[in-house]
């Protein structure tokens, strides 16, 4: 009995399967999440069919070994030549199957976590906080962290040296469509939360908002928003600013990190001129004290909303001055929240203004910022608090750094910048009638340091700060720390 050589059957099956697999490999990039899922299902089905056919073809080859000796001799010459071709086709099909399997896994991963793209700032936020604006669709995860050691100098034992994992932050965003996305920042401070000696740590939502993109000139945002004031309140990632500590002016006068519940608009009037404006719940004047308005922030925690605040910011980057940006912002609003302060119900109209300039040129980074604030009804608040609440406050600082590594190593991606910062601020620049000034809160700071980035996402910092006050003493400190973004 004459038997048909089995490698011919196997070769025909494999050739057909390879041919059928080509259209899947040539599929265009899916346009929607639904398209992507359909492709995954189709490819997975094809993988299963291809694997089953390989097993079936191998089985037929194995069965050919059971043929009679006469049939084997008759088909021997044909088998020898075509077996080589069949084996080659098997290997080729297995390779295509493996590639297809990898593509399916990649598509599945992209359903949850889109492909990583280069970090860059968007809409005034830091690079890591801007990741969701750079994905096509779906989930984005970023973050940053910073840890430091502080050595208190000449404090005569009143304060202790300390080591602190100051912040670990996660940015979680989700792009629903090209027109709607969600972005958020969740912060873990001081390494832990708990009771007793560990209660200094906390977990906070720094911002969480929905963006609605309408037109480059007009877009909307709603939720818990970062107040668009100064440099640091929007970009507080450790690779951005010099030193281990944020500038004191942007802590004492502009109370970074400052966020409130609100709604507003943002966009670009021209490619060089951007704006942001919000209506937010007002500050709570019960928290105002000698150190300023910082403790009046409500941070979206069951915030009083009897009074509203209004904030607007603009930034301009002139074509004639590459690397230069100039901007300013203003906040106004009542802070009394219809509450009684020893039988009185003041409005506590609160104002805060700031202007800033930044210049980046080759290895040079220069920033300067000035801020001024005014608090109405400061006398009523001072009587309520039992301490002087300044009716005016102000602060300013300038800083400069230069990356010196290009002078030593051409085309190096690393960064090493010595820097200098000078700050001056006074949280009681003007006192209400009948109350004394606290000259210890009228301070200036000289700071020098070194900033090293082995890669753009990682920074190592060392700095020394010299404090002085118009009255009394403030200890100096030496700081050493690390920071990272992702």
Language model regions located:
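A generic structural signal for ordered secondary structure
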Residues: 32-40, 55, 137-142, 169, ...
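Extracellular/periplasm-exposed beta-strand and loop segments of Gram-negative cell-envelope proteins
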Residues: 235-238, 247-254, 290, 303, ...
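A broad helix-preferring feature
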Residues: 22-23, 46, 103, 211, ...
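Outer membrane beta-barrel
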Residues: 127-285, 306-322, 397-403, 408, ...
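N-terminal periplasmic/intermembrane-space "pro-region" immediately following the signal or transit peptide
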Residues: 26-144
């Amino acid at each position: 009995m004459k038997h048909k050589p089995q490698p011919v059957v196997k070769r025909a099956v494999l050739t057909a399967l390879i041919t059928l697999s080509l259209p899947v490999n040539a599929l265009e990039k899916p346009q929607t999440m639904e398209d992507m899922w359909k492709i995954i299902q189709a490819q997975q089905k094809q993988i299963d069919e291809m694997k089953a056919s390989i097993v079936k073809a191998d089985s037929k080859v194995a069965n050919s070994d059971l043929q009679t000796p006469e049939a084997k001799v008759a088909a021997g010459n044909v088998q020898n030549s075509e077996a080589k071709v069949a084996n080659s086709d098997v290997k080729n099909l297995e390779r295509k199957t493996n590639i297809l399997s990898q593509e399916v896994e990649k598509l599945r991963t992209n359903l949850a976590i889109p492909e990583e793209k280069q970090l860059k700032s968007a809409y005034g936020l830091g690079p890591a906080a801007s990741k969701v604006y750079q994905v096509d669709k779906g989930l984005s995860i970023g973050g940053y962290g910073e840890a430091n050691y502080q050595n208190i100098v000449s404090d005569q034992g009143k304060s202790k040296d300390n080591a602190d994992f100051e912040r670990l932050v996660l940015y979680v965003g989700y792009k629903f469509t090209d027109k709607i996305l969600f972005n958020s920042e969740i912060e873990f401070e001081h390494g832990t939360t708990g009771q007793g000696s560990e209660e200094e740590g906390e977990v906070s939502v720094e911002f969480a908002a929905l963006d609605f993109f309408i037109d480059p000139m007009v877009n909307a945002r709603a939720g818990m928003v970062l107040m668009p004031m100064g440099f640091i309140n929007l970009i507080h990632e450790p690779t951005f600013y010099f030193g281990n500590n944020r500038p004191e002016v942007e802590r004492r006068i502009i109370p970074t990190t400052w966020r409130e519940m609100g709604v507003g608009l943002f966009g670009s009037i021209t490619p060089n001129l951007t704006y942001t404006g919000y209506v937010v719940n007002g500050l709570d004047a019960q928290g105002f004290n000698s150190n300023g308005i910082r403790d009046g922030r409500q941070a979206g925690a069951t915030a009083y909303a009897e009074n509203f605040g209004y904030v607007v910011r603009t930034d301009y980057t002139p074509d004639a001055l590459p690397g230069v940006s100039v901007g300013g912002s203003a906040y106004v609003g009542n802070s009394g929240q219809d509450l009684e302060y020893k039988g009185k119900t003041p409005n506590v109209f609160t104002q805060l203004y700031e202007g800033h300039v930044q210049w980046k040129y080759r290895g040079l980074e220069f920033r300067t910022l000035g801020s001024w604030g005014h608090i109405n009804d400061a006398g009523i608040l001072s009587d309520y608090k039992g301490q002087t609440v300044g009716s005016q406050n102000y602060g300013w600082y300038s800083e400069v750094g230069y990356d010196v590594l290009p002078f030593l190593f051409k085309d190096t991606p690393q960064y090493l910048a010595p820097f200098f910062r000078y700050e001056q601020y006074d949280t009681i620049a003007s006192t209400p009638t009948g109350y004394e000034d606290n000259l210890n809160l009228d301070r200036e700071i000289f700071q020098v340091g070194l900033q090293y980035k082995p890669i753009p996402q990682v920074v190592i910092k060392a700095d020394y700060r010299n404090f002085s006050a118009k009255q009394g003493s403030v200890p100096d400190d030496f700081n050493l720390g690390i920071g990272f973004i992702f």
